Amino acid sequence: MYYFLTASKDTTIFSQQAVQNTGLDEILEVSKVYYGNLKDTARSLVKFDLNTLPSKLSSGAVTMSEAQIVIRETQPSEIALAYSLHIHPISQSWEMGIGTRFDNISTDGCTWNYRASGSK
């Protein structure tokens, strides 16, 4: 049996745009770009609401011994033949924000420097 959880919020944060947010962008980015002296790192944050999972497990509606995250690439470019993605839990809350990558970058929500608008 499969039980699917979809993300309740997501955003990409960029080291070179350290106070800008792209929470409404349709693309999540994970990258390192080197151009001369410029180094731009992109990280994606994804939140899954797990609040209903304990009741589903205790009722028997969901039985599981493992969980998987499936990530799909769309139109990747310049990716090495072998690479690894490292996934880490986030220990504090963060805000998604309403920015998009190039058209509507905003300073609300999570950024490289802040987990919510202006708060570290």
Locate the predicted segments by residue.
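Beta-strand-rich interaction/scaffold domains
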Residues: P76-K120
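A short beta-strand-loop element at or near the start of a globular domain
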Residues: M1-T6, T11-E78
